Amino acid sequence: MIGLVGKKLGMSRIFTKEGSSIPITVIQIQENRITQIRNIKTDKYYAIQVTTGLKKLNRLKKPESGHFLKSGVIPGRGLWEFRINNNEKFQIGQSIKINIFNDIKKVDVTGISKGKGFSGTVKRWNFRTQDATHGNSLSHRVPGSIGQNQTPGRVFKGKKMAGHLGNNRVTVQNLNIVKIDQNRNLLLVKGAVPGPTGSDLIVKPAIKI
């Protein structure tokens, strides 16, 4: 399913005629340029590869430079792929714009969530804290027991423990499109999306309507 790559500009709110406030995220979607078309014969699947934005030539690595030179497309800030059906017709260098969402009411937005670093179980998994008093002097935020006894004699995989929090690929589904600003290439969706301001987002039509 084809989508578009955009940039998160931040959050705001708009008011309805009745005066109620709607929290929105503003996503800037510049034109996506097709750099490569994958087919079943050479790649075993159908997809289009796109780029967006601009990147200075002296910032490109040699493989990237050669790839953009071969396709004849202006270098962008990254490369993304969207699976397609074989009956869909696309050409290298073709631009895909925000108007593909004109008839869409809901979208799925994918991004990289904010990294929180190494976090304990209270923050990472919402564990409850232990007693502040009643003889507890050192174990206020510790997770407690992580196993049983000689049997099974190990810690089960997937045990909720302290560790790295955030910086994961996250998809938020079924976000309502509030407004599309064609002139400024802005997509306004209701609610929050993953990642910090300025991060790249993948926006696709919702699959679970």
UniProtKB/Swiss-Prot annotation:
- Which InterPro entries has this protein been placed in? Ribosomal_uL3, Ribosomal_uL3_bac/org-type, Ribosomal_uL3_CS, Transl_B-barrel_sf
Q: Which GO terms describe its cellular component?
A: cytosolic large ribosomal subunit
| UniProt-listed GO biological process terms | translation
| Cross-referenced Pfam families | Ribosomal_L3
Record PTM: Methylated by PrmB.
Domain of life (superkingdom): Bacteria
Query: What is the annotated quaternary arrangement, including any partners?
Result: Part of the 50S ribosomal subunit. Forms a cluster with proteins L14 and L19.
Annotated NCBIfam families:
L3_bact (TIGR03625)
Q: What is this protein called?
A: Large ribosomal subunit protein uL3
Gene encoding the protein:
rplC
